[in-house]
Amino acid sequence: MAIYETVERRLTRAEGIHEGVWVCLTAPDAEEVREVSCQLDIEPADLRAALDPEESARISLEDGYTLIIVDIPVKVRDAGEGIYTTIPLGILLTQSLIITVCSVDTPVVSDFASCRVRGFSTRKKMRFVYQLLYRAATMYQQELRLIDRRRQELEKHLTGTLRDSDLMELHGLESTLVYFATSLRANNTVLDRLTRYKRLEQYPDDMELLDDVIVEIRQAIEMTGIYRDDIKGTRELFSSILDNRLNNAMKYLTSITLLVALPTLISGLYGMNVNAAGMPFAGSPYGFAIVCGFTLAVCAVAAWILHKKHML
């Protein structure tokens, strides 16, 4: 647990929980949850809600505080490039301070603790909420661009050997976009409800930032839809190329089988137990050489015909 406070426009660490501070809980243990719950009269279940990866984005008005849960992107460990999932970020607003709860250390929150966000103050609670949502929306867009860049890299493999790992990675990218689309729509719903709640104090500057957040989230939703269509097209292209390569392989195998069968057919005819007088070139001392030459000529003509028909 870390406690921050803005003093003279500078973010500093605070000694205890009091008015105007930001309580940052990252993967809190039971003792930290109990301490915050007792001091601020907040239900422990609400503090632990964001620690459940299955928790959906929502906003809830409780007695004495407001609970906001949104989804943020996080990279999947030990997965390929561009493979992400979403996890909940909990924001609790009381009359005097703000609390954030997350199961992992994420740039959405850590950028504020590292003073990388301008115009940030722990005392401006609603502005802080909108800045968190804005940071999450821009992070979605950054990850979406990385996903599309990785898709383009996979497309370059089409000219060479297509590996099973490429198909699995493409499936992972598509799954990531499904998670993003679902989470962004849920975040957009939470944002719409925030604009209608009169209980949350709003300022004109906050409303301008809120408009920016709405624009960024909608843009992220549009980007997700576009990139999903792109990946769908890439997947269909992969499938078409694999089918085409299989068809070509079958054509080559069929052509080679035909060329191998011609000498077998001719030699089989001469190997039958029949009267030699009825077999061409049977009486010639050069009969074997003539038959071999004729066989080669037939195979050469057949190979030329197959090549003209793009079967060899």
Label the model's feature ranges:
Residues D41, V215-L312:
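Hydrophobic alpha-helical transmembrane segments and their immediately adjacent juxtamembrane loops
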Residues M1-Y203, L209-D212, E216-I226, M311-L312:
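Peripheral, non-transmembrane regulatory/ligand-interaction domains of membrane transport proteins
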